[in-house]
Amino acid sequence: MDSENRPFLKEDGSILTRPAGHGALIYNLNAMEEELVSIKNIDNVCVERMQPTTYHWKKVLMGRALQLRDRIRGYIFALDQISSAGNELNRLSGAQFITFNVQEDPYATEECQALCNEIESFLREELCIEMPEAKSCRERAEMLRKKLDRPVRVCGMVKNEGEPGGGPFIIREKDGSTSLQILEGAQIDKNNPDAVAALKSATHFNPVDLVCCLLDHKGEKFNLLEHVDEETGLISSKSYKGRELKALELPGLWNGSMSDWNTLFVEVPVETFNPVKIVLDLLRPAHQ
């Protein structure tokens, strides 16, 4: 669109089209068969002497992602055992089986409620997810399972030293729950003083250092396109042959395109972040 919000026309009268931003990469990621995928900005490079630190922390992120994935899978398996109750329901707890009476609602048992309590505590303490209140024991278990059954990502975060880009935030979702999200400055409501204050006081910065687990508890691929927030997007200011324009872009890859993922933020040393945005960045110690 032009500055008057009219379709931007080229010299020949055709409408100008342009790339939809890095959010389009979710289609590439969705086509991958690998279980574990590492994502890093292409301009985040360093000289050989600094590579060991980067490699070490990449392994830390991968290990943490697998640890988180395995714990989530364990909870899903436990909930599925309860939901598949027939004449008799057995759930393995440690080395013992717990047997539920045929007359008993498996979702209302002390064992199921204890499991739900444990899952809610895990979501709250590990992933900063506060769950909305459920209307019944069954709904509670189903809501928890749905929240668990999502792709997993672990995102490295460095201390904020004034670099341009997004950062880690806790937001309130439409269903009443909270979640961890990476937000760009353009996504912050500048008319909301609390939101602006949160942005200015941010202690950490997103260097784009992610590890993603793409398989579900059955070892099958998630359809990542089902976990994209289609209602989000970015309007960026660009130019074409000296003419200003407004470009609508897809939800950013690590923003709206991954908004419905189970997310964990891990602080990593600033030494792992060595961007080259402009030529003068090559004068930094990390590039000498």
For the regions a protein language model found, what residue spans apply to each?
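Short acidic, glycine/serine/threonine-rich loops at helix termini
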Residues: 1-4, 48-53, 166-170, 222-223, ...
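Conserved catalytic alpha/beta cores of large enzymes that bind or transform nucleotide phosphates
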Residues: 43-48, 58-86, 90-120, 199-288
